[in-house]
Amino acid sequence: MDLRVIENLETELAIEIEGEDHTFMNVLKGALLELDGVTAATYDVNPEQSGGQTEPIVTIKTDGSIDPLDALEQGASRVRDKTDAFEEAFEAAA
């Protein structure tokens, strides 16, 4: 997975996440929206300016109480924690 910063402002971050699809992006978006200070989290895999399919671009907006890059890090940690919890529950049920 490669990341490329598109825009990095005080309360907004847009970053391209190469090689991912709707499955991962929806989970990441959901984890971001659970964070205090995140006012919006969206992603787009077909921006109008691209003229066609692109790698997904996630956009994070905050209220200023959290840096958008820190929010991305915390959101990714939440995804990892949820994945680990699911794996443990699955193994316990098997």
UniProtKB/Swiss-Prot annotation:
It comes from the Archaea. It holds the Pfam family RNA_pol_L_2. Transmembrane segments: none annotated. It is an enzyme of class 2 (transferase). One of its GO terms (biological process) is DNA-templated transcription. GO terms for cellular component: cytoplasm; DNA-directed RNA polymerase complex. Keywords: Cytoplasm, DNA-directed RNA polymerase, Nucleotidyltransferase, Transcription, Transferase. It is found in: Cytoplasm. InterPro entries: RBP11-like, RBP11-like_dimer, RNA_pol_Rpb11_13-16kDa_CS, Rpo11-like. It catalyses: RNA(n) + a ribonucleoside 5'-triphosphate = RNA(n+1) + diphosphate. PROSITE patterns: RNA_POL_L_13KD. GO terms for molecular function: DNA binding; DNA-directed RNA polymerase activity; protein dimerization activity. Its EC number is 2.7.7.6. HAMAP family: RNApol_arch_Rpo11. DNA-dependent RNA polymerase (RNAP) catalyzes the transcription of DNA into RNA using the four ribonucleoside triphosphates as substrates. Part of the RNA polymerase complex. Belongs to the archaeal Rpo11/eukaryotic RPB11/RPC19 RNA polymerase subunit family. NCBIfam families: PRK01146.1-5. This is DNA-directed RNA polymerase subunit Rpo11.
